[in-house]
Amino acid sequence: MTKYIGYVGTYTKGGSEGIYSFELDTEKKALSEPKLAAKLGNPTYVATNKNNTILYSIEKADGQGGVAAYQIDKNSGELTFLNHQLIDGPSPCHVSVDDQNQFVLTANYHSGKVHVFPVQEDGSLQSPVSEAAHTGKGPHERQEKPHTHYAGFTPEHNYVVAVDLGIDKLYTYKLKDGVLTESGSHSFAPGAGPRHIAFHPKEKYAYVMTELSNEVIALEYNPTAGEFREIQVVSAIPDDFTDNSQGSAIHVTQDGRFVYVANRGHDSIAVFEVNQYSGELAFVERVSTEGNWPRDFVFDPTEGFLVASNEETGNLVLFERDKETGRLTLLPSTVSVPYPVCVKFLHQV
């Protein structure tokens, strides 16, 4: 029997109390009922370090926002609070940690900033040592100011990448001794509203999910210069769909053959096959997430399964994934959790 532990970040309203844990049984092809793993205010995004020993979560508390650190029991999935670092103002929306477990990054949608938190030997966090603040605005009504939605590391860890929905830009930074220094930027079409980026694991490609235009943008990435070049833009929703829909999560499979994205409003997962020579995407299929407003999804460590989290209907939905074709098959395993907005597995097979 093979079971994998996962975590769900939530908005703490409507009965939600914080971070929940669950298990995927790959033999039974079923999810366990989620249980509360940590009481925390608005843990809307979580990340685990490479060794699966520490979980970092966004936190909102009493007019402050920041990051909380937890020690992970890899056998039970239980979380033990280590510490947190809070800053006055709204909470961030995205958190990531480098492979060496030296720095945690947060992106703040409300302030348009990226913060850098040094990690101590036990995995706990020091107060932030630097920040990067964006400026500008875009043409869409939601682009009245910068809205940084993602901050993470490039695959070779040469750069930090920040994606800003409010100003249609991607920034690259050098990070040395905890200090961010801007290296360059890449602009997207006005009003696109870029949200998240995912890198190809083998080739020099990256893929950006836009929230406002609900598109996937394929980029060529130069890891030496930290520069990007646009090679393709594809819609993630059908051309004849006219209702409101917003792009959310994007992930590339470990073999680099497929890109998956979630569409909130159309309420679907779209699958694209990657041309390994050009980086361009070819549409494969869209499947319903069997719920409303899929904020996130995740592959299990074998990538034979996909779990989607529907925020408005409060459910996790399980799919089996065909590794050859990329296609998804809905499984009869759906579990409830209030306002799920982020889902992650411990990523070690």
Curated annotation (Swiss-Prot):
Residues 125-151 are annotated as: Disordered. SUPFAM superfamilies: C-terminal (heme d1) domain of cytochrome cd1-nitrite reductase. It catalyses: 6-phospho-D-glucono-1,5-lactone + H2O = 6-phospho-D-gluconate + H(+). Gene3D superfamilies: YVTN repeat-like/Quinoprotein amine dehydrogenase (2.130.10.10). Its EC number is 3.1.1.31. GO terms for cellular component: cytosol. The keyword Hydrolase applies. It comes from the Bacteria. It is an enzyme of class 3 (hydrolase). GO terms for biological process: glucose metabolic process; pentose-phosphate shunt. Pathway: Carbohydrate degradation; pentose phosphate pathway; D-ribulose 5-phosphate from D-glucose 6-phosphate (oxidative stage): step 2/3. The keyword Zinc does not apply. Keywords: Carbohydrate metabolism, Glucose metabolism, Hydrolase. Belongs to the cycloisomerase 2 family. This is 6-phosphogluconolactonase.
